[in-house]
From Swiss-Prot:
It comes from Citrobacter freundii. Probably forms vertices in the shell of the bacterial microcompartment (BMC) dedicated to 1,2-propanediol (1,2-PD) degradation. Expression of a cosmid containing the full 21-gene pdu operon in E.coli allows E.coli to grow on 1,2-propanediol (1,2-PD) with the appearance of BMC in its cytoplasm. Overexpression of this protein has no effect on the appearance of BMCs. This is Bacterial microcompartment shell vertex protein PduN. InterPro entries: EutN_CcmL, EutN_CcmL_sf. Belongs to the CcmL/EutN family.
Amino acid sequence: MHLARVTGVVVSTQKSPSLVGKKLLLVRRVSADGELPASPVSGDEVAVDSVGAGTGELVLLSSGSSARHVFSGPNEAIDLAIVGIVDTLSR
């Protein structure tokens, strides 16, 4: 799993049937303290939301086959899923 910050919303009227009715959000991975890095390793990514996250929230991401299983099956067209909203971080 990875930490990320929700940076926006994706609206897509034409998409794979397995994505119909699912909320798509833009996320950017963050450091272990929850901060956006000054020089991000990668840009924003699209994730499917399973927990009702909103813009600006710190979230947990699951990727690959684990992300697909969140939404019921291995045939889902999903590679990245938001599986949790982070309340606090401590080291």
